Amino acid sequence: MLKAVLKKSREGGKGGKKEAGSDFGPETSPVLHLDHSADSPVSSLPTAEDTYRVSLAKGVSMSLPSSPLLPRQSHLVQSRVNKKSPGPVRKPKYVESPRVPGDAVIMPFREVAKPTEPDEHEAKADNEPSCSPAAQELLTRLGFLLGEGIPSATHITIEDKNETMCTALSQGISPCSTLTSSTASPSTDSPCSTLNSCVSKTAANKSPCETISSPSSTLESKDSGIIATITSSSENDDRSGSSLEWNKDGNLRLGVQKGVLHDRRADNCSPVAEEETTGSAESTLPKAESSAGDGPVPYSQGSSSLIMPRPNSVAATSSTKLEDLSYLDGQRNAPLRTSIRLPWHNTAGGRAQEVKARFAPYKPQDILLKPLLFEVPSITTDSVFVGRDWLFHQIEENLRNTELAENRGAVVVGNVGFGKTAIISKLVALSCHGSRMRQIASNSPGSSPKTSDPTQDLHFTPLLSPSSSTSASSTAKTPLGSISAENQRPREDAVKYLASKVVAYHYCQADNTYTCLVPEFVHSIAALLCRSHQLAAYRDLLIKEPQLQSMLSLRSCVQDPVAAFKRGVLEPLTNLRNEQKIPEEEYIILIDGLNEAEFHKPDYGDTLSSFITKIISKFPAWLKLIVTVRANFQEIISALPFVKLSLDDFPDNKDIHSDLHAYVQHRVHSSQDILSNISLNGKADATLIGKVSSHLVLRSLGSYLYLKLTLDLFQRGHLVIKSASYKVVPVSLSELYLLQCNMKFMTQSAFERALPILNVALASLHPMTDEQIFQAINAGHIQGEQGWEDFQQRMDALSCFLIKRRDKTRMFCHPSFREWLVWRADGENTAFLCEPRNGHALLAFMFSRQEGKLNRQQTMELGHHILKAHIFKGLSKKTGISSSHLQALWIGYSTEGLSAALASLRNLYTPNVKVSRLLILGGANVNYRTEVLNNAPILCVQSHLGHEEVVTLLLEFGACLDGTSENGMTALCYAAAAGHMKLVCLLTKKGVRVDHLDKKGQCALVHSALRGHGDILQYLLTCEWSPGPPQPGTLRKSHALQQALTAAASMGHSSVVQCLLGMEKEHEVEVNGTDTLWGETALTAAAGRGKLEVCELLLGHGAAVSRTNRRGVPPLFCAARQGHWQIVRLLLERGCDVNLSDKQGRTPLMVAACEGHLSTVEFLLSKGAALSSLDKEGLSALSWACLKGHRAVVQYLVEEGAAIDQTDKNGRTPLDLAAFYGDAETVLYLVEKGAVIEHVDHSGMRPLDRAIGCRNTSVVVALLRKGAKLGNAAWAMATSKPDILIILLQKLMEEGNVMYKKGKMKEAAQRYQYALRKFPREGFGEDMRPFNELRVSLYLNLSRCRRKTNDFGMAEEFASKALELKPKSYEAFYARARAKRNSRQFVAALADLQEAVKLCPTNQEVKRLLARVEEECKQLQRSQQQKQQGPLPAPLNDSENEEDTPTPGLSDHFHSEETEEEETSPQEESVSPTPRSQPSSSVPSSYIRNLQEGLQSKGRPVSPQSRAGIGKSLREPVAQPGLLLQPSKQAQIVKTSQHLGSGQSAVRNGSMKVQISSQNPPPSPMPGRIAATPAGSRTQHLEGTGTFTTRAGCGHFGDRLGPSQNVRLQCGENGPAHPLPSKTKTTERLLSHSSVAVDAAPPNQGGLATCSDVRHPASLTSSGSSGSPSSSIKMSSSTSSLTSSSSFSDGFKVQGPDTRIKDKVVTHVQSGTAEHRPRNTPFMGIMDKTARFQQQSNPPSRSWHCPAPEGLLTNTSSAAGLQSANTEKPSLMQVGGYNNQAKTCSVSTLSASVHNGAQVKELEESKCQIPVHSQENRITKTVSHLYQESISKQQPHISNEAHRSHLTAAKPKRSFIESNV
């Protein structure tokens, strides 16, 4: 018969795995008939194929009803343990993560990940291999479960988790616990599974609900311990938040099978539809859609689903990694039937309802802790809470009384039904957790008729006075106030005050095991604390420090709940409070029903009350507890330092009396039905009501529950008072329940039909759904099963007793009713007593008949129910077989995972001894390896935890004594280390090897010594050790003793050391001996660990202070290295030498300095330690401190006189070593104290080079600031280090900016060009962006310099290059326009300005210049017409007043002009700063900021750049060589001053606008302000060579050069220039072009760079003058002479080329009016103006091609057509006719210097100072031979000067827009 029962549908089950249809069919098999079950009519389930059937067909395992949705974690479910093991605190190593089956776990997550996209928050390095989000989520969960840290950014938001879980589960994985064991996934029934039960086969194998203790188990039953290990509840679904499936349109998907309602409970967590199915769900059962694409399959339950796995039931469940957080999901958000619908209650912590297969992108890490979701069934929509104000007031006073020793909390004590739960619920409802409380309709037996929609929201209104209700009833219904407003106010204040302090709460419910377990309590409280708005800082901390979340993971809570609560909750909260991140107020945690938790007391471990007693002393004083407990359980809280408040002293306490009266009055007055039923004649007056009220209150004895149920009977008309004796009124709760049952079950047979249901509900460890109960009932039938409709009728009859909760599970209406069904007091009527044993039997049969394997949890639960059912009682005599063997056969036939269940996490840490014995009898392997303590065998784990009874059981069944974990430790080692003396004795008596060594070479004796267990050590010495020579893996006793001495000394166990030193001769140890394990003496070990007491003890026993350890280190060095100065003092007092040196020549001072122990250093110096001692490497104490970066020690040693320039054997100073380490502050300190910054060691390295080599960015910046020079080694070391390289380049630019600011244009240009040469060509990828920005800045700065030296062609070219990099830069267009205007290319300038205006229409400066240029274009046309008629003076602009008066000196003119320009346009002059937007992470923004700070004060911005190729050069070639003529100073002044007036104001206003309005990047420091350009633009440029053609055929070159080269230089670029978005590249190009160009400009280009400052009106007629061959102006068109027309700097406008090439010096000056403004600053740094104007005039056809010398950035004067060294096109090079290429740098230097007239002072003075008499006709004759001669003479001088100008920096102040237009 047993076999028939067990094997029924076994075949079907197995087949079911393969064939979807072979589920339970109508076929019947013999079934055991249990007591009452036989009466139930039998009906077989139809075979309709629907989702229901599918789920069964797939072999879904069924477990006890936990939540209907209880997803069952097949194999994955872990059992949780309730209690902390008694063993010593485990080290982290013991908490190692169990192994996870790879494929099972990872594959599903891979799938899940596909649809997800990482959130933008998860910024990943592009090159980093990135794992899929799913994989990350998996890792995160693994981290939690395993107790490890969580990978950052892998957290899934609670909402998304839900959906992710769905998918993951369908793959067969428990979303919450990737750790669990073998089979991957919880079944759909598992709380962590959001799928239908039909989803996965593996899931079916194990049901999460394995429980052992029945809810009805009494406290003395040890089996109940198993319950403690249970972790799942009907709330699981709630917890997982995914109990419901939603269709696309948002409707619930419900599947029905044969009338069975499959609608799973809606997500209680869903914000909206939580309560959805209250009424309508049943009527509307839309067909469940299960399209794959739609997401998780709709949940459909078949009969099998009735047996859903209840998540964690008995202790041993998951293979787990216990972390089946999912099953917790449900739980944690398990409904609080108390109408408390907390905010997170919507869908498990806020999960999104729609579980379509959409995956939201992963969000940044979130809290993965989930609170249990509580639901108190007896709280109904009509419950009211009246009174109790006195109680709240009293609690408040007591908690606020700081003098009270018992103010750590309050205990509310009361009998059953006295309103304890209502009080807690009221506080929760008004707290931060009750803002979205939802009233849950309940059908409690006495609840008064409902007049409102049961699902309506009823909020606790803070305005109401708290109304009291029965213990289970507290709702928001507003009581009609029976208390006056005055009295109400202060009372309300008390309840509000307390509620405002509530940060967490917990309800213990006996019929929901999880709520009674310590691990769940810890985890849930932590989760609620995170959600409390007062503790937002705690939440932030958990997000920031994932290891804290890991510490609070369920797995950690099971293994050591005390440590988890202390380290994960109390310590972080205390620290936050100390840091003032938590408001300085008091906070409260509420716990209801501690007595209920006692019902599930485990064999080992704490109950909730003992746990609180153990941990309360660790609570901070500001965190209080308010707990409730039943009066007959007061002893469990007797040790708590709490104030006790009783609700029991009914007759004496007037407040209680008034509360009860107020409640009755309220109910009577609010219901006409009650009024009419309590009055004899239908008319009730106040007297009558008062009498009835007094009678009821008297009968109640203080019980609100009694009053509520009695008044409900009056309200429904079941009771009517017919006489004044009130005999009809029941006198007790027991009578009330009897009356209700009699009304419900008119006959005994009616009750017997319902009895099996009650039995199952009583036996179950968790609330069960109707489907689960249905499965259990039918499991007891062999033939004809009960029909669903019949079953539903019975359930309807019981609906007032078994309240349906939000998750569709059923819970007893009140704990007292549950107890009444099981137990009656003597003399009470025994009608309606139930037999939970039969319920256990039905549940056991349900598990036995379940298809597929049971998981660990289900197996434990099955064992629990088998033991509780005890169906073989009395059969042993008949059969001859003991009942225990029959039970073992039963469980053996029913499941295969006995060993895994035995070793499940909960069963290890809170073992259920009886169920474990049953599992072992059934065949479980007692040597099975666990997932903890390095995969130790079960015996090792239990020995470590000190579970003596379990160890005895394992040894009884033959567990291997010498089985080891992976680290080689045996059970004896674990027991000795943990200090379990009884187990050590037990194991040694059984014959375990005492001398066994683990993999670290330690035996049990050493383990006991390390942890200070002297008694065990002495006991082990008395045991028998292996005789003879030690075998491999064993140890001699003498060696073990020496090791034990070292071990005890190192850990400071002085008692053990004393014991060992006092051993008799047989066991004598050598006090100076070195052990064979660590090689330490006892003294070196103690000194190194800072154990002062032990050191003194050892020295007292004759330990030698000079005795070294195996490595030759004496005790003094051990102590100094670890900073234990007290021990150093002790050793010095015992005769040690303070300057003792070791083998390397190091002294204790060096060792202490090296380790950074300042106090020890100070102590040693005070004792005479030599500061100047050097070790064998030549390093001093200061050197060591610098090398290790200990700044405080460095400062102290320097102050004490340490030599700061001491070099070691390699020539390194402390500064070198500090630069190597990388502490910038130490480096700065040493430099300030006089360290030589340019010191070179023996290998040729300087401190800067070392810092660069080690990539110590902050040190590099610090040294550069202090003036470190950049040598070849520095650049070599910076190669391939973009972050360092950009710092060096910025340093060069900074130096150039300083030069520019000082007016040294030549030196500035050299710096800029040198920087350009150092730019990396490629290879940095993203890191190139900051380089490109910097390059743009340099180009703009160079363009600025060129215009300052009147080299307009080059200026134009540089601006063009900036434009290539940043095509949308209006500043670049503006700059190029200025250059073109200066070279009189008005049309091209006009085009550029128009572009600039388009890009920045609001810039006034640009508009002003545009208007001026338009006017000048008109003037030019007029002047050309006049020129045809004859040489006439050029018409004057209104803004340009030119005079004919000759000006005596050039230098004055320039001086004044320059000054004026600087004054008027400081912004314009500021050198373009480095781009501020630094996209590349490699360049520290702080550095750029620092550099810019230095650059931002002085200097002028550079003019904007324009596009190349806009204007053709207007200049014509000069036919004949001649002397270089310079216009007079006045003539030049005239030109400058013409537009100063209008320009100045514009500069000031415009400059700021430019910066603001520039849409591209921020300004760059120095001559050219550059707006950031899009990355990516590139241009090719050759930095080393340039071809200069000086031929007339190159007119178009000017167009190409565009902006910066007004001089018609032809800069043939070897490659086409491609403007790209990248700022830096272009800059680089521009700079390199310019740099080379400047340096290489050949003499033959001496295009008449006359004082091109003179601004000419449109037509400049030369008033032919003495012997000048032609008096008409020649527009040098960038051809042979490349004359840079009379335009010099940005400050003045160039109307056209002013320079004329004449054969003779022109002596007369054209007259014209001009304003002369004095100039005080040297122009381009050159006071002698002649240099600026010397024009180079070489044979027109020669072209020079010279590599520009690095660093020689010369400024071309008078725009003498410099040609960019980067030839743009070879064809252009040919134009000149000659391809003479300069061969050497000297030539380039020469040409550059010549080119920059500013450099050749001699030339300037001797050959070029030729005054120009007529401004209009200022004609300079360039004499080529003189020029060549001067060039050759000046070459060396120039190159030297160039090098000198290398280092200097300037600070830019304003944007580069030029104002003197």
Swiss-Prot record:
Residues modified as N-acetylmethionine: 1
Family the entry assigns: Belongs to the TANC family.
Gene Ontology CC entries for this record: axon terminus; dendrite; glutamatergic synapse; neuronal cell body; postsynaptic density
Record PTM text: Phosphorylated; by MINK1 and TNIK upon stimulation by RAP2A.
Name of this chain's protein: Protein TANC1
Ranges occupied by ANK repeats: 896-928, 934-963, 967-996, 1000-1029, 1040-1069, 1078-1107, 1111-1140, 1144-1173, 1177-1206, 1210-1239, 1243-1272
PROSITE patterns per UniProt: ANK_REP_REGION, ANK_REPEAT, TPR, TPR_REGION
Biased composition (Basic and acidic residues): 8-21
Keywords: Acetylation, ANK repeat, Phosphoprotein, Repeat, Synapse, TPR repeat
Assembly, per entry: Interacts probably directly with DLG1, DLG4, HOMER1. Interacts with DLGAP1, INA, CAMK2A, GRIN2B and GRIA1. Interacts with TNIK. Interacts with MINK1.
Annotated Polar residues bias: 206-219, 440-455
Function: May be a scaffold component in the postsynaptic density.
Keyword Repeat recorded: yes
Keyword Acetylation: yes
Short name of any one Pfam family annotated for the protein: Ank_2
